[in-house]
Structures are given as C-alpha cells and as structure tokens.
A protein has these predicted regions:
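A hydrophobic, multi-pass inner-membrane permease signature
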Residues: 2-294
C-alpha cells in the first residue's frame, strides 16, 4: 500500500533536495573554478574574466609543472611516501589501539598510556627538537624521514580504540574458547570486522602524507629529495630566471601565479579523487555497521 504524503512532507522533500543541490554546488564549484583558472590565459586571469569556464584556453601552467625533469622524481617519492607511510601508520595505529581497547583486567593501567598519547597529541616538543632528532638518526634526505616523522597519529588511535571497544565481546570469548590468543583475535576477528574503520583511517593517512610539504622542506637538503608537494611549492614560490633559457623565460612571462597555483592544487587533488571511489563503499558500511539487523 502506497501512503499518500501530506503537503508538508512534499514541501520538506523539495526543500531537502534544493538544500542538497546547493551543498553539492558549494563543494564542486571551487574545484571547477580552480580547474578553469589553471587552463586560462594570463590576461584573462589578471582581468578577472574567469568564472564558470576557461578563458583563453591553454595548458602552459601544466606544461611548466610537468616540463621540469625533477617533477616525475618528486612524484615517485610522494607515491613511495604514501604507500610506505600508510602501511607503517596503520600497523602502529592497530598495534596501539587494540591493547588500549581491552578491559582493565586484560590491560591494567591502560588509562596511563592513553593519557600519555593524548598529552603528546596536545603538546609536542616543537619543530627544532624534532629536526635535531631526525638529523641525529640520519633521516635527512631519506624516504624514511618523510614517513616516520608522522608515523603515528593519536587521533587515528582514538578512533580505532573506540571502534574496537564496540565489537561484541562474545566474539573474543569464542576465539579464546577455540584456543586462539590475542594475536589471532586481532588478525582473524577484529581487523576483518574493522574494514570500514581501517579504510577510513587509511584514507585520512594517505591524504595527510600526500598533502604534507613542510617536512620535505625541513628534511630535504637537495631538490632531488623533495616530495611532490614540496617541489611544487618551491617551484611556485622561487621562480629562478637565472637557470632558464630565452624560450623558458618567454613562456614564464605568459603565466600567471594564480594559474600556476591552481594547476598545483588540481594536480594535488587527482590522486585523492582517484582513490576515494574505491574506498567509498567502506564509508557506507561504516555508517550501517552499528544498525539493528533483523
């Protein structure tokens, strides 16, 4: 039987659709505008003519960025950083979160360790001690310096702890009855059930490693060691005409800094836009994970 909606319900549905469309446009338009600016001519950008489509279409900004020989090396460094960093971070997060999610009987004084982690999240030693530590461990100009510098995110640990706490205790008891221990409980039961949480934290970590550029500036003494974000930032900020020939200088004069920045931003978004659709279904699973099932 189809229930007829009241006038108030129909009005609500219409307003809800209008609101969601507005939110969608608010999210999409900045990305579209950045793309339009990156594809527009210098004159059009300076005159403020770019709005909803490129004006004076050209690919000079992307040619400038992609034409540098170091670009692909920096791109490869960023890919390695994301892959290694996400793997290391997920291992650290899961290894820290699982014991902290156990009961007091299983892990006495766990509150002390949790408060230590929270304290380190709120207060840190500062950039200079961190730099000295990384230098003393010979992690300058090393991919491991870019990975281990932010290997453990306390916020992600807290998310994982809360997720593990909500798993049914009967599953752990059944594992122990079958002769399993903590390792089997973690690997065979908790992690498979925590796929939505693992995917969410992995996406957060990947985005963090991909977008982070400050550590590359601090830990890299050579341009060949720059991750992609640091390389693009340095290229845009420090445009060195002394190393260019006449043709390159003429090309640079046709560019606008805003166009270069827009191209940089759009290139930085591409990997995330590619990865997100593959992880989206885990977000849906995470939303319905705690629902009542009949």
């Amino acid at each position: 039987m189809i229930e007829n909606k009241s006038l108030g319900s129909k009005i609500f549905d219409v307003l809800n659709v209008v609101f969601l469309v507005i939110v969608m446009l608010i999210c999409i338009m900045p990305v579209w505008y950045v793309l339009c600016v990156s594809l527009s001519s210098r004159e059009a950008v300076n005159a403020g003519k770019v709005a909803f489509w490129p004006v004076g279409f050209n690919l000079l900004s992307y040619q400038k960025i992609l034409g540098e020989g170091e670009f692909f090396g920096s791109f490869l460094i960023s890919i390695k950083r994301v892959v290694l960093g996400t793997a290391v971070s997920m291992v650290c997060v899961l290894m820290a979160a699982f014991p902290l999610s156990r009961t007091k009987k299983q892990f006495p004084h766990k509150e002390i360790f949790m408060w230590i982690l929270v304290f380190c999240m709120l207060f840190n030693g500062g950039t200079v001690p961190w730099y000295i530590t990384m230098r003393n461990y010979h992690l300058m100009d090393s991919i491991w310096g870019l990975v281990l510098g932010t290997g453990l995110q306390v916020f992600n640990v807290i998310l994982a702890v809360n997720f593990f706490k909500n798993l049914p205790s009967e599953l752990e008891e059944a594992c122990f009855i079958d002769g399993g221990g903590p390792w089997r409980n973690l690997i065979s039961i908790c992690i498979p059930l925590a796929k939505p949480m693992v995917a969410t934290i992995a996406l957060f970590t990947m985005v963090m490693y991909w977008n982070e550029f400050f550590q590359g500036m601090v830990l890299s003494t050579r341009q060949s060691s720059y991750p992609l974000q640091t390389y693009i930032q340095q290229m845009v900020v420090t445009l060195d005409y002394s190393t260019m020939n006449v043709e390159q200088i003429a090309q640079a004069m046709k560019l606008n800094n805003l166009s270069l920045d827009s191209a940089k931003i759009f290139i930085a978004m591409i990997p995330v836009l590619i990865v997100y659709p593959f992880l989206q279904r885990y977000f849906v699973d995470g939303i319905t994970l705690g629902s009542v099932k009949g």
